UniProtKB/Swiss-Prot annotation:
GO terms for biological process: 1-deoxy-D-xylulose 5-phosphate biosynthetic process; isopentenyl diphosphate biosynthetic process, methylerythritol 4-phosphate pathway; terpenoid biosynthetic process; thiamine biosynthetic process. This is 1-deoxy-D-xylulose-5-phosphate synthase. Its cofactor is Mg(2+); thiamine diphosphate. Keywords: Isoprene biosynthesis, Magnesium, Metal-binding, Thiamine biosynthesis, Thiamine pyrophosphate, Transferase.
């Protein structure tokens, strides 16, 4: 039996002697590498926090002391140490979530994958404890992987600093290798000294005594304070935390469990907000990750353990198509620039950055700033393309509405991972954008069905100079190209009923990547004698007027979209028909309006009846019901 086999909960961990902790850390890393190699996941960040997470669970009493993980992809080790070692189905249906999950364990307080939020949760929890007179619980927030580049984190820090008696320990996991831990004993001595109440009392007494001295008192205090601050700045980074009024200790070697435990205990016992700055190495202990210059295996699919090479996934990816076309457009138009929110490689902008390094701006995890900065770039005569995951666009809705659309600025938002993404669960499904963006004036939305249309629509979007545009596309492999058999206005017709059909039964509006499924449905219904027209609007906001005219020729209209059913394209189509006084039923087939558990995209679609079989069955019933109703409505002869 391995040492890891004996650890089932934090109490077991606390019983281990210090001498066995390095072995435990090594076994955890071996476990992570072997398991994530089969399932895929966030390997690099978790290899970097093994010792840190061990120390957290030895010092604090989880779940009584809440441990909040910002960018929750750092929580794999936390799961292991809290009794969740079944990683065989990590991020798969019925298995462990890739993020903290309240449904999984009482040790998980927040289901967190959108960054920069943990400190606000911590502030609220600590205020609640203070208000209720609870003085023996410490709130711990682990932030890192760029979370402190988000403005929300600094808003929270500013508020946390006001609570002088709130028990909050903020652990900054610094895996950016920006600071050197080889500062020596003097820095550790200063850190230990400052983390005592006696030191605080001594400072207050000395300050009062010096300031009371006639003539020279205040100038002398200012001079000594400046010397002290300058010395601290010289030997310690990140003194901005103390400028906010927060106590700071570090940097600490995050791979030295004993050193981290000492720092955490002093922070815990201080009884007020404290920053503990630890230095870790992303990908620690696995050479292929350590040597991976791009992102130290931040997130990846299944891979070969011996080499670190990913298992091949055949097929062209949507992100790759966007990446390639952006480089081509960049060569043709020098005014096209790109913005990313700490997602240069995942969103496909790395190639553009390599080709045009002066025309890419990585603003950190700051989507709000990205949107308004893009508006400024547009005002300056450029055309910015903001590449962001669809789920993260939610974070800057006000900026899109008021800073970009209100000013009619030509900004293109490229929304990657739109629709159901699957493996990463509720927080990463991009199923909200088509709904929330419907209300934005002056905004146009394009949804490509294949690689050819993604290239076309991206170019069309960038050519629009009197308002913002959105191009959304899913995660994964691009389906085969579906050629249009006809065009009506700006829409592509993908299927027509058999010749001789006077009045087609069904108009099937296929939104973007749902086109392939809709064409399969049309073929199934045709075998049953049901006449179906399949159209791809290409641009779903504003709707092409030709869609209304085409709908008038059919008995039923059905809209199939990879978005929440409420307030999206289906509702827009129904509203357009009502405005035209057309009494034609419109049925919307989209994602159920709930937070979805992690599973494969195809599996989730099938469960919701959004696969070809489920849609064909339902649409057959709808067409039959409509035909019966039409017969009943006919006047008696």
């Amino acid at each position: 039996m391995t040492l890891l086999d004996s650890v089932h909960n934090p109490d077991d961990l606390k019983k281990l002697p210090d001498s066995q902790l390095p072995q435990l850390a090594a076994e955890i890393r071996e476990f992570l590498i072997s398991q994530v190699a089969r399932t895929g996941g966030h390997l690099g960040p978790n290899l970097g926090v093994v010792e840190l997470t061990i120390a957290l669970h030895r010092v604090f009493d989880s779940p009584r002391d809440p441990i909040l993980f910002d960018t929750g992809h750092q929580a794999y080790v936390h799961k292991i140490l809290t009794g969740r070692k079944d990683f065989s189905k990590l991020r798969k249906e019925g298995g462990l979530s890739g993020y903290p999950s309240r449904a999984e364990s009482e040790h998980d307080f927040i289901e967190n994958s959108h960054a920069s939020t943990a400190l606000s949760y911590a502030d609220g929890l600590a205020r609640a404890y203070e208000l209720q007179g609870i003085t023996d619980r410490t709130v711990v927030a682990l932030v890192g992987d760029g979370a402190l580049t988000g403005g929300m984190a600094w808003e929270a820090l500013n508020n946390i600093a006001e609570g002088k008696n709130r028990r909050i320990v903020i652990v900054v996991n610094d895996n950016g290798r920006s600071y050197s831990p080889t500062i020596g004993g003097l820095a550790e001595h200063f850190a230990n000294l400052r983390m005592t109440r006696g030191y605080e009392q001594m400072l207050a007494t000395a300050k009062n005594a010096i300031n009371r001295a006639p003539v020279v008192g205040p100038p002398l205090y200012d001079a000594l304070h400046a010397f002290k601050k300058g010395l601290k700045d010289a030997i310690q980074p990140q003194m901005m935390f103390e400028d906010l009024g927060l106590k700071y200790v570090g940097p600490i070697d995050g791979h030295d469990v004993a050193a981290v435990e000492r720092a955490l205990r002093r922070a815990r016992d201080f009884g007020a907000p404290v920053i503990v700055h630890v230095l870790t190495q992303k990908g620690k202990g696995y050479a292929p990750a350590e040597n991976h210059d791009e992102d130290q295996f931040h997130a990846l699919g299944a891979f070969d353990v011996a080499t670190g090479r990913p298992q091949s996934t055949p097929g062209l990816k949507w992100t790759s198509v966007f990446s390639d076309e952006m480089v081509r457009i960049g060569a043709e138009r020098e005014d096209v620039v790109a913005i990313t929110a700490a997602m240069l490689h995942p969103t496909g902008l790395a190639a553009f950055a390599e080709a045009y390094p002066d025309r890419v701006f990585d603003v950190g995890i700051a989507e709000q700033h990205a949107a308004t900065c893009a508006a400024g770039l547009a005002m300056g005569g450029l055309h910015p393309v903001v590449a962001v995951y669809a789920t993260f666009l939610n974070r800057c809705f006000d900026q899109v509405l008021m800073d970009v659309a209100l000013h009619r600025q030509p900004v293109t938002f490229a929304l990657d991972r739109a629709g159901i993404t699957g493996d990463d669960g509720a927080s990463h499904n991009g199923m909200w954008d088509l709904s929330i963006l419907q209300v934005v004036p002056n905004l146009s939305i394009a949804v490509p069905r294949d690689a050819v249309r993604l290239r076309e629509l991206l170019r069309e979007a960038i050519s629009i100079d009197d308002g913002p545009t959105v191009v959304r596309y899913p995660k994964g492999v691009v389906p085969p190209a579906i050629p249009a058999v006809d065009q009506i206005g700006g829409m592509d017709v993908l299927r027509r009923p058999a010749s001789g059909t006077e009045a087609p039964d069904l108009l099937l509006v296929a939104v973007g990547p749902m086109a392939q499924t809709c064409c399969e449905v049309a073929d199934r219904l045709a075998d049953q004698g049901i006449g179906v027209t399949v159209v791809d609007p290409r641009w779903v906001k504003p709707l092409d007027p030709a869609l209304v005219s085409e709908a008038a020729r059919h008995s039923v209209v059905a809209v199939v979209e990879d978005n929440g059913r409420v307030g999206a394209v289906g509702d827009a189509v129904a509203r357009a028909l009502r405005d035209a006084d057309l009494d034609i039923p419109v049925r919307t087939f989209g994602i159920e309006q709930r937070f979805l558990e992690h599973a494969k995209r195809d599996r989730i679609l099938a469960q919701m009846g959004l696969d070809a079989q489920g849609l064909a069955r339902k649409l057959t019933e709808i067409v039959a019901q409509r035909a019966e109703q039409s017969l009943e409505d006919e006047p008696a002869s």
